[in-house]
């Protein structure tokens, strides 16, 4: 999704995610109306520009949080967290706190958290905006690889056409 600042891109994502309510119309996902479904029951992962990691939780706890909300048994949650960390090449980082990670590592944790519960759709609000050029290019490749390997639909927002053409999946 491409548009200038203030054009409603983030608002659109927030409505898809269920954090804001549309004033008119309905939202459909895979042919089903989801407008009145709570965010945690929509099956949508979200990656924010600022990562939105819980600073008081470890990497493992950040990834396990959406699974706890969905009441996934711990043994199954452990497997899902391991799989998500593997997808973003962060095995062995489970016990670290977000502040102990680089910006790129934090972003990969945010991506893993958006995927850990096997969503139908992943929304990304300027997910690479805070990263330097080299890291941004590396993360674009990783996100594209994840998209291709697991087949999840990704909607990404950008305010600049220069970044938009780089992130087309």
Which residue stretches match the model-derived regions?
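Conserved ABC ATPase "signature" region
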Residues: 33-35, 68, 75-93, 144-145
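Short coil-to-helix segment of the ABC ATPase nucleotide-binding domain corresponding to the Q-loop/switch region
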Residues: 57-65
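A short, proline-enriched helix->beta-strand linker immediately N-terminal to the Walker B motif
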Residues: 116-120
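Single conserved hydrophobic/aromatic residue that forms the stacking wall/gate
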Residues: 161, 168-169
């Amino acid at each position: 999704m491409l548009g200038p600042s203030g054009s409603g891109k983030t608002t659109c994502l927030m409505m898809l995610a269920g954090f804001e309510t549309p004033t008119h119309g309905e939202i459909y996902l895979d042919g089903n109306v989801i407008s009145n479904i709570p965010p945690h029951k929509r099956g949508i992962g979200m990656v924010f520009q600022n990562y939105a990691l819980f600073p008081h939780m470890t990497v493992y706890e950040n990834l396990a949080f959406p699974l706890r909300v969905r009441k996934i048994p711990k043994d199954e949650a452990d497997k899902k967290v391991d799989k998500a960390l593997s997808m973003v090449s962060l095995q062995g980082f489970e016990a670290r706190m977000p502040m102990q990670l680089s910006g790129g590592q934090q972003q990969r944790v945010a991506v893993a958290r958006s995927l850990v519960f096997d969503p139908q759709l992943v929304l990304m609000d300027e997910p690479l905006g805070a990263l330097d050029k080299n890291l941004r290019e590396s993360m674009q490749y990783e996100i594209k690889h994840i998209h291709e390997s697991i087949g999840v639909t990704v909607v990404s927002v950008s305010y600049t056409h220069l970044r938009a053409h780089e992130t087309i999946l």
